[in-house]
């Protein structure tokens, strides 16, 4: 009887340890299924909702489970002035360093401007952050939006333009 009880307790303990290990999150770039769950279908910005392009969505999750996501939006319903600034959404649950500038957790719009700046705006279209982006002329296959790991951070690409993003 004692052996049976010990086996049951041992099995239960191993099961609990296995469940705890399975629930641990490791830092990673989000896959398509994770993005489907996290990315909104529409995004409110400057008094309007814009459809979000899920096919052009990227993100990462940190070891503590917090996420940051970016996606392009269809900004055709906005004024020309806003379309020139606002290309996508940026939602972060953690503080970020973007091109050397700090960004608090929150929901934002972003855009790679023609003047060489990556701009982040609050949802009222007020500028929050501006940093110089880089251009990768050697990039063979540019895509609308891509995220790659880069040391302790990431590079967010829009075509051949990119900006460094690091969780703080």
Predicted regions and their residues:
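Hydrophobic h-region of N-terminal signal peptides that target proteins for export
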Residues: 13-22
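Short acidic, glycine-rich loop/turn motifs
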Residues: 19, 60-64, 96-97, 120-124, ...
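Bacterial N-terminal signal peptides that target proteins for export
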Residues: 1-10
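Mid-length scaffold segments of soluble, non-membrane domains
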Residues: 75-123
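Acidic, glycine-rich flexible loop segments
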Residues: 110-142
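Primarily secretory-pathway and cell-envelope proteins
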Residues: 23-81, 130-168
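A generic structural signal for short, solvent-exposed coil/turn residues
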Residues: 14, 52, 82-84, 102, ...
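Short, solvent-exposed loop/turn motifs
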Residues: 67, 97, 102-104, 127, ...
